[in-house]
Regions:
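Residue-level signature of outer-membrane beta-barrel architecture
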Residues: 429, 442-444, 485-487, 527-533, ...
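N-terminal accessory segments that precede or flank the first globular/catalytic domain
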Residues: 31-204, 351-488, 507, 526, ...
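Active-site nucleophile-His-acid catalytic modules used for acyl/amide transfer and hydrolysis
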Residues: 217-293, 547-550, 614, 619
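Outer-membrane beta-barrel "beta-signal"
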Residues: 440, 623-635
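Solvent-exposed loop/turn segments connecting transmembrane beta-strands
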Residues: 427-437, 469-478, 509-521, 535, ...
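Transmembrane beta-strands of outer-membrane beta-barrel proteins
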Residues: 421-425, 438, 463-465, 497-505, ...
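Repeated loop/turn-to-beta-strand initiation elements of outer-membrane beta-barrel proteins
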Residues: 446-453, 488-496, 532-540, 570-578, ...
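Long, charge-rich alpha-helical interaction segments
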Residues: 297-386
Length: 635
């Protein structure tokens, strides 16, 4: 009988295979057991009810329980994760034990803010996991080199329907990197439609997805400062290093999903609060949400919680140009315009100017050339030729600073706005009859209010109403109820001409030919210009139509065409508006409506003002005097 000996190499392979078969089930069993223990521990701690878990997934209470504001169904790990915090928590823990594959982002990285929180809460042993997403997160963190976050506020841009309230986004301050060379984090609507009324309407109803994007900061400044000509304000967020880390994790996690973007409430101003609240959960910033979330009110809220440092002002190209223009006389301005439009040679620069004056003139010219190019008034070829000529001439001047080097910081700053909501009570006399009234405004700003945080002498009001009681007649009447009342009065300038407009829509009392008033649908629109005639007095002129619609009128309408002229003077806590208007019906020669009106405002406090008015008006060959005063409370 022959004894056969086994080959040693074959014996070794069989032994390894045997050991592998024994070890793998044990490892899988060990993982499953650990995974089960974590889920059990999370349930014992009721983590799915924890306020922080609800915050991380953007859950808000609904009629049936909870519902996340995140609208991307693929972002949730549980099939019913959008409405089931418990199922989403369990699915999240399960996902941490998924094997790493090349074509799928591992959940420990994709959900890095959840990962950090659950590791701390459950004391997760990362060695028991197939993959640690913090390895990838550390690379992103090293690339961005986050030192701190800044909140950036480009001021309101009244001539764009979607920018009337301004905007908010984040700036990442990196080590040894100037702000303009840094990165920004923007949350906004992803839309292919150009800014327009249709764009605004679709945005109101959430027709666009909203996403976080990481963009170079200089591109943001180019857009807001040079193209839109909006001043920007930077506020450093008062957060620790660990809080900055938490905030960055949440932003990265949210970059994998989207929400339906609503211009009025679920907008940039509201959605950027989630990363800040993730860093500072004690603030509960997202719990209160009004029908409209305004950037200036968010700044006010963050300031109240001590989250914002001092404001850093970054003037727009428009502000820089207007400041430089203030140091130029008429002949210098005329020369610059001709030079930039190719009607004058740079060698013909006005004589007798100091080096500082020449430097200021040439710096203004370089800015104006940029504006002309962006406004498509000159071609790229014309711009390059003239811009190089201007820069060459400027470099020949030895002085480093021009006359307008220092640009003063505006006294009106966004962090100190009045409350957006307003209630008022007042009394007065109207055509010999005493009255008392009460007013309400849902939001935001009247041109007679303090300007802090809003465009000076502008107006943007939503849902305002005034109820009056006439003492002699013993009758209540709704004087008006406006859905929207907007007045834009940018200052007209010969270099950068801007046009104003007004729009008012709602219901209002309207005088009929029989001498009685009736409530009718009201639509008023006009266009015009505005300019400063004194340092503190702004004049304006509008021309347009004032229309009323009711079944009591011939052809169901009362159409008036005409115009209005006015002067607004601001001096500290006092503001005055004097105006006159005249409108004529094209169908009735006796239907000529005119009014001369004076309004005064004394600001008693940031959120309290005393207002008064006097009016002399007439229509259908009848005239009347009215006067009154009111106390307005903003909150």
């Amino acid at each position: 009988m022959q004894i056969k000996f086994l080959d040693k190499s074959r014996l070794s392979l069989r032994s390894l295979l045997f050991l592998f078969i024994l070890i793998i089930p044990f490892k899988l069993f060990s993982q499953t057991e650990y995974e089960t223990s974590l889920i059990k521990k999370a349930e014992e701690l009721s983590l799915y009810k924890d306020d922080y878990w609800l915050l991380l997934c953007h859950y808000k209470k609904s009629i049936t329980g909870y519902k996340s504001l995140l609208d991307d169904k693929n972002f949730f790990l549980a099939p019913d994760g959008k409405k089931n915090p418990k199922a989403e928590l369990e699915a999240t823990i399960h996902s941490f034990f998924n094997e790493k594959t090349e074509d799928v982002i591992h959940p420990t990285y994709k959900y890095s803010s959840r990962y950090k929180w659950l590791c701390n809460k459950l004391n997760i042993d990362k060695n028991q996991l197939p993959y640690d997403g913090d390895t990838e997160y550390a690379k992103i963190k090293e690339m961005l080199k986050v030192k701190s976050f800044y909140l950036v506020f480009p001021a309101a841009y009244m001539n764009s329907p979607v920018s009337m309230f301004g905007h908010l986004f984040f700036l990442i301050e990196s080590e040894n990197t100037p702000h303009l060379a840094g990165m920004s984090i923007n949350y906004g609507a992803i839309a292919t439609d150009p800014p327009s009324l249709i764009y605004a309407i679709k945005g109101i109803f959430g027709a666009y997805p909203g996403r976080y994007e990481i963009l170079p900061y200089y591109k943001q400044i180019t857009k807001y400062s040079y193209l839109d000509m909006r001043d920007t304000w930077e506020y450093k967020l008062n957060l620790s290093d660990d809080q900055n880390d938490t905030m960055l994790r949440h932003i990265l996690e949210m970059s994998f999903t989207y929400t339906d973007y609503f211009f009025l409430d679920e907008n940039c101003a509201y959605c950027i609060l989630f990363p800040i609240e993730a860093a500072r959960p004690d603030t509960k910033l997202t719990e209160e949400r009004s029908l409209v979330v305004e950037p200036v009110q968010v700044i006010r809220k963050l300031k109240k919680h001590g989250l914002l440092g001092n404001a850093e002002y970054r003037p727009s190209m428009y502000s820089k140009m207007m400041h430089k223009k203030g140091f130029m006389n008429y002949s210098q301005k005329k020369f610059v315009k001709k030079l930039c439009l190719g009607k004058a040679e740079i060698s013909n620069i006005p004589e007798g100017l100091s080096d500082e004056e020449k430097a200021n003139l040439l710096e203004f010219a370089s800015d104006y050339l940029i504006f002309l190019l962006s406004d498509k008034k000159i071609s790229q070829k014309e711009y390059q030729k003239r811009f190089i000529e201007v820069l060459t001439a400027r470099n020949k001047i030895k002085c480093e600073k021009s006359l307008a080097f220092e640009i003063p910081v505006p006294t009106s700053q966004p962090q100190n706005p009045h409350g957006s909501h307003m209630v008022s009570t007042g009394t007065g006399v109207d055509d010999g009859d005493f009255f008392t009234d009460a007013g309400f405004r849902l939001l935001a700003h009247n041109m007679m209010d303090r300007d802090d945080g809003y465009s000076p002498n502008s107006q943007i009001e939503f849902c305002t109403a005034n109820l009056r009681y006439n003492v002699f007649e013993k009758k209540f009447s709704l004087r008006y109820a406006d859905i929207v009342n907007i007045v834009s009065m940018p200052v007209y300038d010969s270099f950068i001409p801007k046009k104003g407009f007004l729009l008012r829509a709602g219901v209002a009392q309207n005088l009929c030919s029989d001498g009685n008033e009736n409530l009718a649908f009201h639509l008023k629109g006009a266009a015009g210009i505005s300019c400063f005639i004194l340092k503190c007095t702004q004049a304006y002129f509008f021309i347009g139509a004032d229309n009323f619609f009711s079944g009591k009128y011939n052809y169901n309408s009362d159409i008036l065409a005409g115009g209005e002229i006015g002067f607004i003077t601001t001096a500290g806590i006092w503001k005055q508006k004097i105006s006159g208007s005249i409108y004529q019906s094209p169908f009735d020669i006796e239907h000529t409506r005119f009014e001369a009106r004076a309004e005064e405002r004394l600001s008693l406090h940031q959120h309290l003002s005393l207002n008064a008015f006097y009016s002399f008006s007439g229509d259908f060959r009848s005239t009347k005097h009215s006067a009154g005063c009111s106390l307005r409370l903003f909150y």
